[in-house]
């Protein structure tokens, strides 16, 4: 398969750390034999992470914990028997004997907690919230085999498990837990909040419907190949069962010149972000091909009427992914308080790191959470 052929399938993919030839820890028999890199071995990724003691790759990231400032505490907790790696950001002068509202921040497809999810978690802590950014199960620094499984059920449970952790975190007001989902994490956040009312407020930034994109292709570019791709995913699952070999949709390895020629803003700017400017060693777009069996049956926009909490959905006004948020927001008939907010001039990826757009998003979040949480 040529790079440009799999680009359409894999660019919005999942994240994971390298774990080649590792035994599968559930069935106990499966062994990964993939030749696909399951992490980012690039010099850019290593250099970015090395700049910060916590491995954070966003601007103005915490580099040490100091009194009177936002602090970061790496934590680990169990979810369905797996170890989940997370960072908890606490406000300046945090006092565990007091009561604080808290926010779960769900990372994008292709992201880890040290990237945009960490940025927004830190900024929320600066506003006085306890915030948690975590790596999805089977991805990043979290546990799970095979690596890079990327299924909706897992991603939704990850969000719930982060809230479970906050329920037991001393200083968190259990009646004031909200959620912020970014990109793919936004789509899964909508699903989690439809049924789990632990989340008192729901916000998304540049939400991405992973099911819609995997099924139809981004901007409906792959509708004609749905059945063939389902057949390929079915064959990949059968291969796992019969041989133990795990097939992956690979992470595209493109030159700067090839990236510049990509016409979709999301994919072009996303590759720049994840492969260059904000690359992280644990971040990759590779995911197990068999995951498509669940992904292609997922729809973030279905049952949106079940959300009765205050809802804020933010998109860049120039984002080519905005149709996904529009589609989901249109179905949100169950809440009396909802807002679809456009960040003027921003593309999808711009909202991840460009100060002029991050500041607008944070100002809106401050208002939204302040009024409703």
Outline where the language-model segments fall.
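The serine-hydrolase catalytic nucleophile loop
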Residues: 110-122
């Amino acid at each position: 398969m040529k790079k440009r052929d799999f680009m359409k399938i894999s660019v919005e993919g999942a994240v994971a750390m390298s774990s080649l030839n590792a035994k599968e820890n559930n069935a106990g028999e499966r062994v990964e034999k993939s030749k696909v890199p399951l992490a980012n071995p690039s010099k850019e990724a290593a250099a970015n992470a090395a700049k910060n003691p916590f491995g954070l790759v966003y601007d103005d990231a915490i580099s040490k914990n100091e009194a009177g400032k936002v602090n970061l505490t790496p934590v680990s907790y169990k979810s369905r028997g797996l170890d989940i790696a997370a960072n908890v950001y606490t406000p300046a002068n945090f006092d565990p004997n007091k009561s604080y509202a808290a926010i779960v921040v769900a990372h994008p497809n292709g992201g880890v907690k040290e990237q945009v999810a960490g940025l927004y978690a830190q900024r929320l802590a600066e506003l006085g919230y306890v915030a948690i950014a975590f790596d999805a199960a089977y991805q990043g620094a979290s546990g799970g085999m095979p690596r890079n499984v990327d299924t909706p059920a897992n991603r939704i449970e990850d969000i719930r498990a982060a809230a479970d952790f906050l329920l037991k975190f001393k200083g968190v007001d259990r009646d004031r837990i909200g959620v912020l989902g970014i990109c793919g994490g936004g789509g899964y956040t909508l699903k989690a909040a439809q049924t789990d009312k632990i989340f008192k407020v729901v916000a998304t930034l540049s939400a991405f419907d992973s099911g819609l994109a995997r099924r139809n292709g981004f901007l409906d570019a792959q509708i004609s190949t749905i059945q063939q791709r389902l057949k390929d995913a079915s064959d990949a699952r059968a291969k796992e069962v019969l041989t133990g070999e795990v097939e992956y949709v690979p992470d595209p390895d493109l030159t700067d010149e090839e990236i510049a020629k990509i016409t979709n803003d999301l994919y072009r700017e996303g590759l720049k972000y994840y492969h260059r400017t904000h690359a992280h060693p644990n971040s990759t777009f590779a995911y197990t091909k068999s995951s498509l069996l669940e992904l292609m049956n997922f729809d973030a926009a279905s049952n949106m009427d079940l959300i009765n909490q205050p809802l804020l959905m933010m998109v860049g006004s120039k984002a080519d992914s905005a149709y996904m948020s529009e589609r989901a927001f249109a179905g949100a008939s169950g809440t009396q308080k909802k807002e679809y907010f456009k960040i003027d001039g921003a593309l999808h990826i711009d909202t991840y790191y460009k100060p002029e757009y991050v500041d607008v998003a944070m100002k809106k979040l401050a208002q939204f959470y302040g009024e409703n949480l």
